Amino acid sequence: MKTRILIRYGELSTKGRNKKMFTQKLASNIKKSLVDFPQVKVIPDYDFMYLDLHEAPEEAVIEKVKPIFGIQSISPVYIVEKDMEVAKKVVLDLLSQEDLEGKTFKIMTRRSDHTFEMDTNQINLFLGDAVLEAFPDIKVQLKQPDITVRIDVRREHLMVSLKTIQGAGGLPVGTSGRAMLMLSGGIDSPVAGYLAMKRGMEIQCVHFASPPYTSPQALEKTKLLAAKIARFGGSIQFLTVPFSRIQEEIKKSVPEAYLMTIMRRFMLRITDQLRENARALAIANGESVGQVASQTLDSMVAINDVTNTPIIRPVATMDKLDIIKVAEEIDTFELSIQPFEDCCTVFAPPSPKTKPKLEKARQYEARLDVEGLIKEAVEGTVIEEITANYTTPVETASQEIDDLF
């Protein structure tokens, strides 16, 4: 008996003529997530996708593909010949491994081969009677049973499955275009990146580093956050922007109350230039309306003035507790609250303007060599690929020492 993993599509089922493009992208993302299991073969089909395991561990493969967006649900399926006696034996064998006391069940048959000798109702009755005879403790329940035995009659074979595992939903990463995520080391921006990816956006992470004011640990922490969200799409390009000189120049020339506004305007300009270089379509960030001084509507107007590029704000209307809940679900929260200050925190004024005037922001900014500073920062940007398996140099060194002993 051969085992496969069946993947059911989420919103892809509604995509009409574009469905092939969506399924191909999903297949590509799944292959990237299974880099540790090169023997697994991904087989896209119109209604489903299959993974041929070729001796790869079933549970480990399922754990790798569960976070991939575009998947509605996952089921281990057993491929058997088109013989109902064989199918009955497989169903009874599988159920014998379950705790059935006090449980309910139903048989659910899907028949794409309409030439098969039995119709859907006949298959349900045949297998249902066999289960009741073999396991007297179990009862039939057609609505919300504890166990659903799924039978799929295909042209080549029958497929039997007992378990359905919830997938991540959403759209395959990359099907909605590319966006640049402004990734700090905080709680909100990784959640924003996750939610943007869930709507099919491929993201590249832009991080502003200000050594020596910010530590190497702050940078590594942010790379680890990128690795956490890379699980949902395969791999992510991480762009480290040198920002110290810009912050020093701003602090010399701009009134304290406007430091944050001007700094954010520079960040947005630089991200927009990097977006253009990467041929991305939008910028995403973790701004939540009213949460801090730079995230009031007045501040957003003053900061957004520097670009016409669409700004995606996935957490804009979420309460902090709701953002934290998502951060905990995607395993970024504990990392985000590690006490390493980012460039915004280090240079934050004690009383930033919550209602900055656009005219004043432009006036103060005119004191600076805006184009020259942006050009220098963009040219000094370091790009690297971050995967879900990324580890910090400290972790790698520790592992190498452990391996010696």
Language-model-detected regions and their locations in the chain:
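Small/polar glycine-rich anion-binding or flexible loop at a beta-alpha turn
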Residues: 289-291, 339-347
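Generic beta-strand/beta-sheet core signal
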Residues: 8-10, 163, 206-208, 241-244, ...
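A conserved beta-strand->alpha-helix junction
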Residues: 226-252, 342
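Conserved G/P- and acidic residue-centered "switch" motifs that form tight phosphate/ATP-binding loops
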Residues: 186
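A short alpha-helix-loop-beta-strand transition element characteristic
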Residues: 331-339
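General small-molecule cofactor/ligand-binding pocket signal
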Residues: 141, 239-241, 312
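Active-site adenylate/phosphate-handling loop in enzymes that bind or generate adenylated species
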Residues: 129-131, 170-176, 247-248, 252-330, ...
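RNA-binding accessory domains that recognize and position tRNA/RNA substrates
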Residues: 1-180, 190-236, 353-361, 367-368, ...
